[in-house]
């Protein structure tokens, strides 16, 4: 598993690059103006230097205000968690909070609830997935949620059987959904569940993508045409956004293909995809919340909904040169649960390096710890990141 320091750095990178990708998806007129020379329909684009599009990113970060109420900047639900698997829903839910959501709910099996709750008192944990009334228990919370992240594990048999009902209820309320892990397995079994629902974002890794592709298109993935394969899968599912994670993340909404090749961490370990899906949940809400006024009059194109973002799977941790202990447990000595009063964070260090596209150096632990502060408390200037970044 990733270290706590690595997890904090990964969330920092995820937040910046994923916000940029979300802005690209939703606002076609500004995007065409900014990247007119590079972008055309049905063409693959590799994005490395997107300095001109960073204003789109800044525009969708909601500014803090004393007039707002709790929950207005994001109430995210994560569905998943059983006795054997408590880490994935925790990482997804806590990532949503670290990116800037106000409230994060976890709907899990009863055996997982005490463990997940013990990880963080900030999470609102509902032990309902193994209840005969699981769908009803989750559905009554849907009017209060802005997005749902599905992390169902096949080990949660009763809850997994109710997953379809929860998804259908979410679609009926037009709630954006992010589907990862075994949620993708269920989609492969029943593609009609998300067919044509363009507020769905699928985040498969290589193996999950191959399974989905074979189930939907009845054939193997063309290894020589990965870009076309992602495009075809998205089209076959009715222009659902597909994010194939890998060395280069390939993103498609069925109309365009975007390849993000910005390098993340070279480590591949458990928990990285969970950071992505949890971050996506709140970013979907932010992008929809921003509205056309944030794009100089550009109309919100719901057919595009959102590009799946490129996740920075983690900037190498300072601990032991990026080879620290493989744990994300809350007791990890590398990143305390609460910032130490003796530590004065360096404002936005790892974010600054990402925005400037400088060579990425391992972030300091204070930088990782201060991510949540800067994403939530440096937004007072009309949603803009601090100029110091």
From Swiss-Prot:
CDD domains in the record: YXKO-related (cd01171)
Binding site for ATP: 245-249, 264-273
Compartments, as annotated in UniProt: Mitochondrion
Domain of life: Eukaryota
Reaction catalysed by this enzyme: (6S)-NADHX + ATP = ADP + phosphate + NADH + H(+); (6S)-NADPHX + ATP = ADP + phosphate + NADPH + H(+)
InterPro entries xref list: CARKD, Ribokinase-like
Any one of the GO BP annotations: metabolite repair
Pfam families: Carb_kinase (PF01256)
Modified residues (Phosphotyrosine): 85
Domain YjeF C-terminal residue range list: 53-389
Keyword NAD applies: yes
Enzyme class name: lyase
Binding-site list for (6S)-NADPHX: 153, 205-211, 274
Xref: NCBIfam families: yjeF_cterm
Family: Belongs to the NnrD/CARKD family.
Miscellaneous field: This protein may be expected to contain an N-terminal transit peptide but none has been predicted.
Name used for this protein in its record: ATP-dependent (S)-NAD(P)H-hydrate dehydratase
Species assigned in the record: Macaca mulatta
Gene that encodes the chain: NAXD
